UniProtKB/Swiss-Prot annotation:
Subcellular location(s) of the protein: Cell membrane; Membrane; Perikaryon; Cytoplasm, Perinuclear region
Expressed in which tissues: Expressed in dorsal root ganglia. Expressed in neurons as well as nerve fiber bundles connecting ganglia and fibers innervating muscle layer of the gastric body, jejunum, and proximal colon. Expressed in arterial endothelial cells and neurons of the central nervous system and peripheral nervous system (at protein level). Expressed strongly in lung, weakly in brain, heart and muscle. Expressed in enteric neurons and vascular tissue in the muscularis propria of the gastrointestinal tract.
Keywords: Cell membrane, Cytoplasm, Developmental protein, Differentiation, Endoplasmic reticulum, Membrane, Phosphoprotein, Transmembrane, Transmembrane helix
Gene name, Swiss-Prot/TrEMBL: Tmem100
Coiled coil: none
Role according to the record: Plays a role during embryonic arterial endothelium differentiation and vascular morphogenesis through the ACVRL1 receptor-dependent signaling pathway upon stimulation by bone morphogenetic proteins, such as GDF2/BMP9 and BMP10. Involved in the regulation of nociception, acting as a modulator of the interaction between TRPA1 and TRPV1, two molecular sensors and mediators of pain signals in dorsal root ganglia (DRG) neurons.
PANTHER family: PHOSPHOINOSITIDE-INTERACTING PROTEIN FAMILY MEMBER, TRANSMEMBRANE PROTEIN 100
Gene Ontology terms: cellular component: endoplasmic reticulum; perikaryon; perinuclear region of cytoplasm; plasma membrane
Organism the protein comes from: Mus musculus
Annotated protein name in UniProt: Transmembrane protein 100
Amino acid sequence: MTEESTKENLGAPKSPTPVTMEKNPKREVVVTTGPLVSEVQLMAATGGAELSCYRCIIPFAVVVFITGIVVTAVAYSFNSHGSIISIFGLVLLSSGLFLLASSALCWKVRQRNKKVKRRESQTALVVNQRCLFA
């Protein structure tokens, strides 16, 4: 199998490789090329995990949320309203809530898409079954 047919099978991009130019201390221009990665190659490398970001966000969001609770509690236990630590705690708290909410939203959208795909495939099966028995 040739290299070109392998690239076509993996979905390699058709455009030329990107080129970056840098100047080194001797005032010479160094040209560095880097490969482009297509979505197919990314899915092959990650095993399709790029579509499950909501599962990765949840643990990080929980840690940030708990840290925000602790920092805010410590700040307000010393009556330091408006200090840097209380603002930092509130920022962590709100960031954790935002990450949890976005993760829940992504999960709901993903579930809805799965339901639509199931319904479409079931409709196709019923139509095929009717054609067979008609």
